[in-house]
Amino acid sequence: METAAAVFILAALGLVGAQTVAAARFRARILGLAARLHDTPAMRSLEGRLPSLVADFARRAGVEPGAGLRLASFAQDGELRLRKGGRFTRTVAWQVVALGRAGFLWDARQSLGPVQHLRVVDAYVGAEGVLEARLFGSVPVARMSGRDLALGEAFRYLAELPWAPDAILGNPELAWRVTGPDRVEVRLATQGGTARVTFRFDAAGDIVGMEASGRPARDAAGMNATLDWRGTFADYRQIGPRRLPEYGEVGYVWPGTGYEPYFRGRIRDYHVAP
């Protein structure tokens, strides 16, 4: 009996040790992605190339052309559901966004009580997409890569530009085109195709809506698909050094049932850095 108990204890300790090592390696990988974003070029001064509606939005946010910044970062409190019709789960995240080249890192955690049960990393670094989820930060449960994922992450980078106004003025990879009195399209070329997002501005010149067609996604059965994508921004206020929309929501337009959000949240603790 004592021998069996000792074997059980040793096995448990070994499992805990393996999980600790795996979690440490995952954390190191996340920090490595953040370091690669820090090595991207600083933002440039491109105000003269932009539609006035876009340039005015960035300047009103507090962006200073030629400031030489590389990164924006912020914390996020939100709700996320992982499948169509699923329940929302509280999610906290830390996000870093490159300003002079397309790139971001989203490091999110979902918890059950005091225990973190899922850690999700969603990123676009070096023109490649990364999507990985781990139970307890150590046990892999999902991992994706490839050209479709990279294109989908490029869509996300564009859609979240209202939270990175310095990139609007300073990223030369972005191409802008006015498509209506209150609408502007922004494009980003990738190896898997061109990501296109259209922003809708209100009468005050703030971005309040986002829409895109053909974003790579998974359908309700988990199969590869392309879907229309929608988002909203609201509650503009000063957050750190920038005037930004505190609230954001995004979801897919599902055939037959229409729009369904899968993420909604608020940002805080906003910073920019060279």
Region roles according to the model:
Residues 132-190, 221:
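Flexible, processing/modification-adjacent segments and terminal tails
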Residues 26-73:
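N-terminal leader/targeting segments and the immediate start of mature chains
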Residues 56-139:
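N-terminal mature ectodomain segment of secretory-pathway/periplasmic proteins
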Residues 1-40:
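N-terminal membrane-anchoring alpha-helices
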Residues 80-90, 106-116, 158-171, 186-192, ...:
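Short, solvent-exposed secondary-structure boundary motifs
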Residues 92-95, 123-126, 132, 166-171, ...:
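Buried hydrophobic residues that stabilize the cores of well-folded domains
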Residues 185-274:
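Gly/Pro-enriched, hydrophobic low-complexity segments
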Residues 94-106, 119-131, 179-182, 200-208, ...:
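Short, solvent-exposed coil/turn segments at beta-strand boundaries
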